[in-house]
Amino acid sequence: MDQVVKIRVILDVEEDIFRDIEIELDAPLMHLHLSTLDAFNWDNANEMASFYQSNEAWDKGAEYPLMAMGPEFPSMENATVRDILPTPTSRGLYVYDYLRMWCFYLEPLAIGAAEDGVGYPRLMMEFGTTPDPMSREPEGLDDAGLFDDVFSDDAKTGDPEIDAYLDEDDDETPGMENIDDHVDLF
């Protein structure tokens, strides 16, 4: 008989927000991914995500991304719930939307036999009001100096010849600001 695990999926926010989901241990991680989004009412969300094996300190272990980087790599399609939660004391992480970095903690509450006639996965408990998945600002994009090095006028390469070339004045031709200023060159 198939085994099911009851997982507490805790959203990492200031308020207490979690969902308890029952799912078969041998179900693909894709089923847990979709049922987690559905349980948190993020079913219209279409961002990248990954599951990770974890430990008591919630460190990231082996990664199971939404899409594999190649046929020999694991993904949510070819890995199972058992891969991230191999024992009753295992822990897992789920990261959704790499720009907004929504992090969920996964803890198994119980493992038992599947009930006949019951469809899995299924939502067993809801606690807390889920925020909108777009309510969090993307991380790292609000840094005022993020692109200073890329778009700096005084960018230096470290090579004196190249730096001298880059420092040459572009306005050697008087009154020429842009090539478009002289459309009748030919």
Predicted features and spans:
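Short linear regulatory motifs enriched in tryptophan with gly/pro/ser
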Residues: M1-F186
